[in-house]
Amino acid sequence: MAKIGRALISVSEKTGVVEFSRALAGYGVEILSTGGTAKLLREAGIAVKDVSEFTGFPEMLDGRVKTLHPKVHGGILGMRENPAHVAKMQEHGIEPIDMVVVNLYPFEATVAKEDCTMEDAIENIDIGGPTMLRSAAKNNRDVTVVVDHADYAVVLDEMKNSGGSVSCETNFRLAVKVYQHTAAYDGAISNWLGARTGDGVAAFPDTLTLQYKLAQGMRYGENPHQSGAFYVEKGSKEASISTARQIQGKELSYNNIGDTDAALECVKQFTEPACVIVKHANPCGVALGANIMEAYDKAYKTDPESSFGGIIAFNRELDESTARAIVERQFVEVIIAPKVTEAASEVVAAKKNVRLMECGFWPENPAPRFDYKRVNGGMLVQDADLELFTELKVVTKRAPTDKEMEDLLFTWRVAKFVKSNAIVYGRDNSTVGVGAGQMSRVNSARIAAIKAEHAGIPVQGAVMASDAFFPFRDGLDNAAAVGVTAVIQPGGSMRDAEVIAAADEHGIAMVFTAMRHFRH
């Protein structure tokens, strides 16, 4: 590659641009710029030529037209090794531009503001920036294009090692990054405007554009005959499996990631020290405790058999004693916590294959978001299920005691994360038995009781949560038969009166939430 002789720099995000420009000037690079960037560089003592001087044409239309000029785009797009291009550039007095450093008006940050108007949004749609970026990316054999300030150091290192040029390989990588960036930028504009084509603001835009970045490849997908990879959402920041840091252990598998997501999102529901153990995307043991050691011990004892090879999530810092209890007691695939002490890391290091993850802490009230589910030829989109209940209405003659209500709310939170049809038995802020994924709700109840019996835990005196209404009274009859004293469910069945009557017959207290939590 030839040495960089001229760079056009015009950025909204100005992190590091002064230092970068000063370094370019040190290589004798002529710097062209516009507006606020030119002002900033001049104030820093860096020689700058205005683009309007370079083109011989003034900025106009309140700055909407600055760089949309043949001398700019001809200087970027002209192929240096094409004699016809070179001749035309010389004929029209077009000088080459060897580097384009541009980032875009902050459209997404602007529309994220509560008081953003349509005019604000429109004025933050960049036109000249994407045009220059795409021109430079297209001609990446001859032009270096930088859209991310994180790449300034990479470019300067290459220029230092080469005497002022950037390799074709780096130029190509930077060009690909440009197209990824402009695709996401246009997608954000399309999504925002597409929700405003009618009266008011639609819940969902006319078209939906999403961008995910490859986070890791995998040996295989859900099964060994399937290939797999993990992509993360652009701009994802909330504590999650997508943002978590792996401290040690084998590479996360496709199933590890899905199961860890289920465990972490479930444990986020609780403010008290909590432990969630997940197997095949279903909680098999969940408990609260005075500390996470107690919570883990209770959760494990719910279903020791299913906990083997499970995923364990905490909502508090993982300490040495809890880490030791886990690795000495059971085989575990993944442990994830918001923070991990150094001593806990050292304990887990004795089991080199265990994947230890640190995800950071999360806000008590998560921001609204969408859930996506791929179907053949399409995608289902919905609001994430972040709410717990619409109301708490006692519908039976007997109201639950304070202790029963505490356990009902605990099991209700767990039931949100159990595959439907979901039944959860619980007592003393711990699951007693979990029945998941059955086509018949009463069968889920039977399985929950079998699980409890298998673990040697009596159901007598426990409460029950159901993720959806009972269509018949048999669910309540079954609950009474195993000793359940209180039930929480959404209600809404045609036979609610029959189900309530069954509860009253058995002396069971029952609460309706008016909110269903199907999970498929």
Swiss-Prot record:
SMART domains: AICARFT_IMPCHas, MGS
Keywords, sorted A to Z: Hydrolase, Multifunctional enzyme, Purine biosynthesis, Transferase
Domain of life of the source: Bacteria
One GO location term (cellular component): cytosol
Signal peptide, first to last residue: none
Family assignment from sequence similarity: Belongs to the PurH family.
Name of the molecule in the record: Bifunctional purine biosynthesis protein PurH
UniProt source species: Geobacter sp. (strain M21)
Encoding gene (name): purH
